[in-house]
Each structure stands twice: as C-alpha cells, then as structure tokens.
Curated annotation (Swiss-Prot):
Thermostable up to 50 degrees Celsius. Thermostabilized in the presence of both fructose 1,6-bisphosphate (FBP) and Mn(2+) ions. This is L-lactate dehydrogenase. Its EC number is 1.1.1.27. The gene is ldh. Beta-D-fructose 1,6-bisphosphate binds at residues 159, 171-174. The modification Phosphotyrosine is found at residue 226. Homotetramer. The lineage of its organism: Bacteria, Bacillati, Bacillota, Bacilli, Lactobacillales. It comes from Lacticaseibacillus casei (Lactobacillus casei). It is found in: Cytoplasm. NCBIfam families: L-LDH-NAD, PRK00066.1, PRK06223.1.
Amino acid sequence: MASITDKDHQKVILVGDGAVGSSYAYAMVLQGIAQEIGIVDIFKDKTKGDAIDLSNALPFTSPKKIYSAEYSDAKDADLVVITAGAPQKPGETRLDLVNKNLKILKSIVDPIVDSGFNGIFLVAANPVDILTYATWKLSGFPKNRVVGSGTSLDTARFRQSIAEMVNVDARSVHAYIMGEHGDTEFPVWSHANIGGVTIAEWVKAHPEIKEDKLVKMFEDVRDAAYEIIKLKGATFYGIATALARISKAILNDENAVLPLSVYMDGQYGLNDIYIGTPAVINRNGIQNILEIPLTDHEEESMQKSASQLKKVLTDAFAKNDIETRQ
C-alpha cells in the first residue's frame, strides 16, 4: 500500500454507480477528497456519462481525474469503495438481501484482489456487516484493512434527531448507534451527551422531554430507511456523505473515531464477526476499536444484535457454498 503515504495523489476506485455510488462520487468531488476516482459498473455507459458529468463540476471545486474504470485499475488504488448490490425494496429488510448480494460481492472482490490491489476495502452494500465480513473472507486481507460503513449513517440520524429535539447544532451532539446496521441496532444512551451535558441531565432539566419521546425518536432513527424507501424508492445522500467522511479519514490519515463495521476479536465478548462500534481509522485501516463501557441493557442489545448477524451469516455461507481465501 505504498501510494497512500503519498499525500499528493490519492486514488479511489468506486464499484457500483447506482444512486449511492454516484452520490458518493459527487460528495467526493464537492469536498475535494482524493485526486483520482475510477468508477466501475456493469453499465459502462453510465460510468462514462457520470465521469463526464462529474468532471464538469471540477472547475468549481478542485482538480481531479475521474473516469470509467475496470477492476484492473484497482492495482495501485489506495481505497476501493463497494456500493454495488441489489437495492433494498419496500418491506424488505437489509438481511433479506444477503443471498443476492453475496454472489454479486464475490464477482467484485475476486478480480480486485487479482489486480494486485493492496489498499483498504470500504463496504457499503447491504447487509453491510455481513458483506464486510464476506469481503474479508473473500479477499484474504488483514481484518484491519476491510471496513464497513456500519452504523455511521444511523449515528448521524440519531445525532440529528437529538439536535432537532433540543435545538442545537448536530455537530455538538455526541452519541452513538451500535450493533447491526439494521433492525437490531441500539442507541447508547448511557454515553450520549450534548456539549458535555448527558442526555439524562438534559431530560432532568427539561421535564417536557419524556422517556417515551426518546424511545419514539430512536425507533424513527432505526426505521428511517424504510420510510425513505417508501417515499422515494431509495436512500443515498446520507450514506454517500458518510462514505465520503470515512474516505477522508482514511486518505488523510486522520485517526478519526467513527462508528464503523469492524472485526470483533474479543471486544464486547464477541469473536469472528463484523459489527458496528466506534473505532479509530487512518490510512492503514482500523487502528483500534474503542470498547465503550455499556450498561447491562446495552450489553444485552449488543449480544442480541451479534447473535442475529451470526445466524444469518452462518446460514448464508452454508447456503451459497462460497469459496474464500481465509
């Protein structure tokens, strides 16, 4: 992974030019992240068209090379971002997608690894925790160099909801959603705070904020994707911006703490699974995992979420008989 240490030229290969992928590329252009973006998709005309369209925005932002790419172009990339996969339909859970997207994923990871790619995989296709684990198994890469978007979007939704409730800037809210990016995710209320004031203290000072309001707020966060899909067919702006933030942390060697899908090696009593938790990320991938002290209820929620993921993961690999590199 020699090129990622060269701050003057950072190369990203995006696999998947659907709504999420193209929105991600646009976010990268607007924020001036990376100097080269290659876009891979089975629909070549779409990647060519998007490359031209995005390049037209460069005079308003910063110089960048954007082009329709092949898997072989990943050989000297710093980062491969995978958004390709079957989209989530109305009424369909993220876990329902697993069998369809496992097969798609294998057709992506194999040629990327064969190209000589030696950077970092960032996975966003759903179900993200399972597909990130699958990317690790299929690639044979070290676990720190395969990461998923995890609960980054859920956490952003959570912070925004709290911010709207108390009328502050969402960037001043510090709170996390952990676990599966999906139905078994949970809020870490015990460490949530607004500018250092805990949620418990805030509620005590504002009796109009009842517990049932907080419960409803989290449920709306958890189910936000279903509502958006019902209204407009897909979610993409939020996750695309989250992916751009993660990419920036990797490429700029930030050592940023972000809620990501990472490999558990004893943390929270979990092993051999990818799941959402705050972690430190830099140009080498995951530097370390922050094991937040959880309440008994939160710990129970983490175990429940992991158990659900483990079951689906085991069933999916058994059913699809996928050959892996580790």
